[in-house]
């Protein structure tokens, strides 16, 4: 079997990723050592924090690009794991990877066995993983939204944003999602189930948002920054709460 990999070709210059930042390569499967698992990547999570790793030099040219994964055990020399088990690990952008003792290129992480009968294995890098925990902690733990309050969530169609929207609805709040294009707005309305959504690309964005908040905003889940934050700030009520999760703009 061949291991297909995306590696960092150069330290990014800034702004948006460019195809010249990455290089495709193939090679042999790595040799497995005691205490390790050889796993096949099934799902890969692409997250905004990865871009920061590359721009800051945590990843250097030649490194396999970082990424959390759901994988299946191909070969095991680690107690408690067998061939065929599904695990949450950090294979990165490659078809196969080693997990376990002595693996440090992504920072050591214990492989976690997944129960495919309890939930879809893909949820380990979604609602039951880092994305879900971020939304849960940022919204419910930090902001403690109350029934009837107005909650605004930026980048609402993203991985963290869509979970935060649903948690706010479960809490009995009136939820306004901010996103970009029409496809994302339709997703928020038809699938996520927000009460209202508005595009930050609209020329009348600030006026539209203000109209949707006649009684102000009680909770703001910040993922964007920039002009979106500036539009929400005047709408915040006394004793309102803000979670700053990211500044992707």
List PLM regions with ranges.
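NAD(P)H dinucleotide-binding glycine-rich loop of Rossmann-like/cofactor-binding domains
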Residues: 65-72, 83-155, 197
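Short SAM/SAH-binding signature in class I
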Residues: 215-221, 240-241
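Glycine-rich beta-strand-centered segment in the early N-terminal region that forms part
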Residues: 28-46, 52-93
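Glycine-rich phosphate-binding loop and adjacent beta-alpha segment
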Residues: 188, 227-249
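Mid-domain Rossmann-like dinucleotide-binding core that forms the NAD(H)/NADP(H) cofactor-binding site
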Residues: 125-203
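Short amphipathic alpha-helix with an adjacent loop that forms part of the alpha/beta core around
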Residues: 204-215
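Short glycine-centered segments of the SAM/dcSAM-binding site in methyltransferase folds
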Residues: 86, 150, 174, 240-242
């Amino acid at each position: 079997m061949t291991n297909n990999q995306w590696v960092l070709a150069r330290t990014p210059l800034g702004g948006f990723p460019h195809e010249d930042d990455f290089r495709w390569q193939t090679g042999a499967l790595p040799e497995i050592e005691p205490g390790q698992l050889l796993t096949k990547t099934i799902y890969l999570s692409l997250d905004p924090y990865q871009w920061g790793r590359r721009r800051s030099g945590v990843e250097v040219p030649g490194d396999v690009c970082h990424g959390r994964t759901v994988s299946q055990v191909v070969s095991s020399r680690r107690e408690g794991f067998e061939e065929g088990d599904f695990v949450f690990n950090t294979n990165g952008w490659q078809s196969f990877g080693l997990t376990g003792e002595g693996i440090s290129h992504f920072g050591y992480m214990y492989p976690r066995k997944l129960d495919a009968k309890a939930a879809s294995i893909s949820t380990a890098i979604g609602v039951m993983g880092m994305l879900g925990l971020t939304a849960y902690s940022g919204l419910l733990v930090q902001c403690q939204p109350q029934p009837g309050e107005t909650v605004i969530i930026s980048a609402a169609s993203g991985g963290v944003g869509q979970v935060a929207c649903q948690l706010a609805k479960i809490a009995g709040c009136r939820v306004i999602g901010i996103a970009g294009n029409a496809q994302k707005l339709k997703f928020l309305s038809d699938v996520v189930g927000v009460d209202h959504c508005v595009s930050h690309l609209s020329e009348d964005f600030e006026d539209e948002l203000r109209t949707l908040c006649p009684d102000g905003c009680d909770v703001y889940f910040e993922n964007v920054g920039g002009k979106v934050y500036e539009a929400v700030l005047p709408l915040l009520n006394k004793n309102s709460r803000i979670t700053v999760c990211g500044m992707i703009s």
